[in-house]
A protein has these predicted regions:
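Bacterial Sec-dependent N-terminal signal peptides
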Residues: 1-26
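Phosphate-group recognition and catalysis centered on beta-loop-alpha active-site segments
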Residues: 17-307
Length: 307
């Protein structure tokens, strides 16, 4: 089966040959867990970092989830007027800083004069919008990175990750066709890890998933999203596991993971978070993106599915 830049062969060898492999850094260990179809380890992806305590997509938010023990930082990227990639989810800086206007209207130096906001709209004294370079250096060898809202900047991101030596630690995901992804990746000597997003309740999502099966392409993982329970959900997840990929589930909000009562908020309100997270473990999910990393990590550790 074909794989386009899904993991270094040395990681495959390390997983298959050594019962207790030694890794040079934590990021390498997490990659090996993801690539091992027999691993019971559940990878925790923190959505925009620890945004409940720090500004989202900020360096302190990243440092906090690394201390927690999360495995991957999901971050969002925009480009400044002078072509510097920075961390920002929104098109404008209004919500997250004391400034106004589109990110693209600021030079990087002018953007750095703005102060970031904590939750509840509190402006910090000294936390600034980080560049993608700063964020990747913070994460390097310590945690994996999922770069979101970033496919238009693929070329620039690959050039940056190659310069910093982190290309194999950075994941991008999308809904492009198999052929489109392969064509785009063929333009580069080295590529980021890539994962398709499958909205399995929709005809487009079903078509994309069928395309991967028909072309015999096995990605590192699939992000499977569903708004409501249905036979196609169970069939998709079973096929993903059977073919050797990992299942990524989003518990950020209910429309991504099966409807009302199935998300992070439900886990907080439940008598036991197992009532929510346990159902995804039972389904075979081995990667979970969450807005409640501390809660999810505590649960996974309690059942022996995380360090």
């Amino acid at each position: 089966m074909k794989r386009f830049n899904l993991l270094l062969l040395v990681l495959l060898a390390a997983v298959s040959c050594a019962p207790k492999a030694q890794y040079e850094n934590r990021a390498e260990k997490i990659l090996a867990e993801i690539n091992d179809p027999n691993s019971k380890y559940v990878v925790v992806i923190s959505h925009r970092g620890d945004w409940r305590n720090y500004p989202e997509n900020s360096i302190p938010a990243i440092e906090s989830i690394i201390r927690m023990g999360a495995d991957m930082m999901e971050l969002d990227v925009k480009m400044t007027k002078d072509s510097v990639l920075v961390l920002m989810h929104d098109r404008t800086v209004d919500r997250m800083t004391n400034g106004k206007g589109p990110v693209s209207s600021y030079t990087y130096d002018s953007l750095k004069t703005l102060r970031m906001r904590r939750p509840h709209n509190i402006t910090t004294d000294s936390i600034r919008v980080p560049s993608l370079r700063e964020a990747l250096l913070c994460c390097k060898d310590r945690i994996l990175v999922n770069v979101d809202h970033a496919y238009p900047y693929y070329k620039q991101i690959v050039e940056l990750t190659e310069e910093l030596g982190v290309t194999g630690q950075v994941l991008m995901k999308g809904k492009s066709s198999v052929d489109k992804v392969a064509e785009d990746m063929s333009k580069h000597e080295k590529n980021l890890l890539y994962m398709p997003i499958i909205d399995i309740n929709t005809p487009k999502g079903q078509k994309l998933f069928a395309e991967y099966q028909e072309k015999n392409v096995v990605p590192l993982a699939y992000e499977v999203c569903w708004q409501y329970p249905a036979p196609e959900v169970d069939d998709c997840i079973a096929t993903v596991i059977k073919t050797g990929s990992k299942v990524w589930v989003n518990t950020l909000w209910s429309t991504l993971c099966g409807g009302h009562g199935n998300d992070d908020d439900a886990a907080v309100n439940a008598a036991d978070p197992a009532e929510v997270y346990g159902q995804y473990i039972d389904m075979g999910a081995s990667m979970i993106q969450t807005d409640r990393p501390a809660l999810l990590l505590d649960y996974l550790r309690s059942i022996g599915r995380h360090d």
